[in-house]
């Protein structure tokens, strides 16, 4: 007798598995985890080095023969611009530079050491710090000609230091002098804020700022410290052809020993109901006054 044919199913096949598509508005596993962090797979700087980012800062670094560059990164839309910038450099410089590596924009977003999204404009350079000059060499090269210096008394914010460097570049400052301690090292934040000035204004580091002031005074350089209780107006700075302006940290201002070593204490007149000026703004005003007498 032939077996009956029918539609009976095994009990395990009663409800076959179905493939379901996500419903509208449902959360996938990626949604639950949240958006991926920008620069999660960001490039790493070389040992003892750092990143410089932004069009002006990177191009200034490329043009500086003293700047050692490990790697160059660009996005697809800026790679050709960066290559053309390199091609325009003297051959003695361009042959020392690495080829441009095209990289996804999101990877470059996360190169900052503080985790903030980098405003890199599609250009990043991995570099090593410049060799800092000695104060004695700076003074020797200046000779007896008129010149300007800035001294920073324990300014630790790289953004402030970078902004001061930018003003120093604009007003022809020969060098900026700071201390080894309580001062920022060369880094990307400083370079980005300086907008290329890091490659033009030497950053001199000294162990003791008071002794550095004594060296300047021995070289016939007038040292003027900016202070809210200064007795001279900032316009008076223009009378000194060889001048070093000392800036203190926001809040504490100049340390006592630094104040005692200054030849003059100078103030910037502000409205009586105003608290104070940002130190980088104060530096720009002082440099302008030293140049124009205004």
Region spans (language model):
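Short basic, glycine-rich beta-strand/loop surfaces that mediate nucleic-acid
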Residues: 111-128, 194-198, 202, 240-248
């Amino acid at each position: 007798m032939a077996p009956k044919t029918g539609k009976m199913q095994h009990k395990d096949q009663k409800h076959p598995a179905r493939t379901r598509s996500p419903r509208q508005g449902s959360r996938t596993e990626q949604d639950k985890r949240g958006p991926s962090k920008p620069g999660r797979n960001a490039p790493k700087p070389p040992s003892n080095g750092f990143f410089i980012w932004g069009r002006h800062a990177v191009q200034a670094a490329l043009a500086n023969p003293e700047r050692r560059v490990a790697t160059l990164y660009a996005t697809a839309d800026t790679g050709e611009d960066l290559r053309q910038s390199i091609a325009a450099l003297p051959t003695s410089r361009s042959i020392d530079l690495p080829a441009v590596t095209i990289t996804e924009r999101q990877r470059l977003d996360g190169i900052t050491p503080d985790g903030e999204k980098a405003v890199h404009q599609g250009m990043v350079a991995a570099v090593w710090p410049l060799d800092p000059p000695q104060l004695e060499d700076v003074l020797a090269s200046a000779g007896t000609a008129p010149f300007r210096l800035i001294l920073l008394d324990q300014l630790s914010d790289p953004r402030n230091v970078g902004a001061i460097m930018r003003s120093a570049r604009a007003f022809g400052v020969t060098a900026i002098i700071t201390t080894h301690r309580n001062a920022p090292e060369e880094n990307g934040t400083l370079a980005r804020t300086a907008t290329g000035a890091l490659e033009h204004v030497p950053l001199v580091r000294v162990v003791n700022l008071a002794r550095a002031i004594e060296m300047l005074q021995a070289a016939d350089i007038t040292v003027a410290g900016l202070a809210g209780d200064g007795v001279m107006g900032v316009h008076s700075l223009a009378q000194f052809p060889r001048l070093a302006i000392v800036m203190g940290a926001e809040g504490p201002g100049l340390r006592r020993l630094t104040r005692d070593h200054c030849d003059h204490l100078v103030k910037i007149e502000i409205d009586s109901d105003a608290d104070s000026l940002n130190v980088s703004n104060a530096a720009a005003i002082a440099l302008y006054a030293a140049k124009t007498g205004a």
